[in-house]
Amino acid sequence: MVIYNSPMDYSIERADEKQKKCLSIMEASEFEKSKRPAFHLASPCGWINDPNGFSFFNNKCHLFFQYHPYSNKWGPMHWGHAVTSDLLRWNFLEPALAPDSSFDRGGCFSGTAIEDGSFHIIAYTSVIEGNAIQNQSIAIGDGKKYVKKNSNPAITAKNIPFDYDKAHFRDPKLWKENETYFLGAVLKTDDGSGAFVIFKSRDLEKWDFVSVADRSLCELGMMWECPDFFSLDGTDVIIISPQEMKEDLELGFHDGNNSVVMTGTMDRSSWKFSRNNVSQIDYGIDFYAPQTTLAPDGRRLMIAWMHRWEGFSTPDDYLWSGMMTLPRELKIENGVLFQSPAREMDALRKNGIAGDENLPPEKEIEIKGVKGRFFDLLLSFVVPQNCEWLEMKIAKGENCCSKFIFDFKNKRISFDRSESGTRKDCESFREFRFEIPEDRKINMRLICDISSAELFVCDGRYAFTNVFYSPIEADGITFAASHEFRLEYEFYQLK
């Protein structure tokens, strides 16, 4: 595998050449194709992480992503690019950005994109080689090719009226209100904690500092990453991905990097944000850096990196590393975020079966017809007063499985992939606290795509995303409960 060692070697043309070669190898090999998801965006070649520029332009949905096509490990960041018409089948285009300019040879880091008339405008973090100083830059394109503005970088330390860590100022969120462009970014303040700062411009050239809209006082981790800002169902929303958070099982936070939603009110005169509610977005091991967009039909959609920084689970022999979650529809109820798979998922369903099953106490059973690695499973049940737990195993083979455990006694849901075949040097267990509804009825939905499991509990009040790497032939699904348990189900194979 060729690795270009000098930043001067990086170009869109070379990245595109590498991508095409890698895709052709995978297309020609049934073995390589068998490793890839059917309806999630996965890296076309090498490494991907954060979703970038999630947006609609020219009647298509565009998703860019942090990209290093030359190995399956993180390296100098490019922007990969894919488009879709149905949110399910992605077509890869040539990479949009490469670290090939004097102001971004240290990498083209994360950012966002908007449709503005006939132009597709990208805001991204440009990293200076050597000193790793991070600034914000602009590129303008037609949906296929993107040109960096000659005036880049657009926003630097000169635009900020206070001291901060100049190696930690990144991830611009771009939006437009009336005729004014706004750009929100995150930076590390003098005490090491993160802040969400806002700038404005009339022409994408001259930017004025507006406010510190919100910041961590070290209670929400340290440096913040990948901010988003939008309004939904009458509520203003800021999304951030804080680093170095401390575990708080009651609030759903775990040690390390988290992804957090803050609902409240943004004062449009002072551009200061008042929080009403703060919570985890997804409680799973493999979810980070979510980004949203507004669909033409008015839905707020979200997608995230289905991976994690604290240890990588992708097998070393893969030609690629990194996937995105399913696009999810969002809504806010009483300040709380609810998520559900984009409704386009329903078009993939086939061979549906439905019924109910009475589980005997402490006996593992299979349900006829319920098996596979590409499926959509809907479960509904009333938790018996005396029932302590329900266990569901997926990707069950002769010597492997991954399992969800619903601990009703202690109000915990956990995922355990320690026996899945996934490499042992990454985290294998995660749990979170949930509330059992007053009527004790729980609805949940699990979507599996070869090596990923996205679970939505209590109609999307809780999301729980995890990946696992088990042999493809491991396709069993079993259920067990501590006491007699009635389970209603719908099960669909997914194309």
Pin down the residues of each PLM region.
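Catalytic-domain carbohydrate-binding cleft regions of carbohydrate-active enzymes
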Residues: G221, C226
